[in-house]
Amino acid sequence: RSSGQLLFDRQSDAKIMTFNDNVEARKGSSTVFSDKLTIFLDPQTKQTKQAIASGNVLASQGTKIAKGSFLTWDVNTQCAILEDSQNAEFVKEDLNINAQKMILYKDTGKIDIPSPGSLKTKTNEKPGRKKAFGKSSTADNNINVKWEGKMNFLDDSREAFFEKGIEVKKDDSLLYCDKLNVTFNENDYNLQSMKAAQKIHIVDKKGSLYSEAVGDQVTWNAKNMVTVLTGKPFAMLREGNKRQILAPKILFYENSNNVLCEGNGTLYERRPDNKDAQDT
């Protein structure tokens, strides 16, 4: 239904209906509000081939909400394309995604985003949860990811893949990389595992002290609560101006706040008398 003018147009490959002003469209559990709705009908079957909502678009289906300037639904591919010149928004339970363009697949729950964007999770904190990287012991279940390349989200396997110019924020820790794969809990969006590669740079704040780590790959999972940083030939950990460690493999045990280095490495430590000490 709409409060404005309804226009009909007949073309060789489709019949077109255009609804204007305060449009509301419902089908099953889905509802779409928009300023304009254009429906393309197959001239033979008289069934909908494609529908384009434009203007201030707000769509909902169960716990899922989508906002943007354009929403295109294609019957053949069973996918919806959500677009906005600024940022389109997709919300599902504890998951929030923003990007200029999103492709949402109905049957698989897959989301493809070919443009820069951000992903945020907002789950309730649970006692005993630790950070997914860095060494702070603050419990935090939320993760914020920004990327400059693209993102693919697979709801069936609860995975998200990110590429290029990635920034991951978790409490007071930042992870920068160019490739990232994260998995979430089956029942919510608590972070279950993470694997990052290419241009790894971790910045962690603990009180007034900043520590940094650099390497080629970092992994973490919720079972053992250990962050594993590797580098070729070395990964590097620097704790302010007090200590620097070079090793092929550095493990951060978050429950005990300990660090283990594997392989041949080097430790540089500044003594209280400001003289440097080196161990290999």
Identify what each model region corresponds to.
Residues R1-T280:
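N-terminal amphipathic/hydrophobic interface segments
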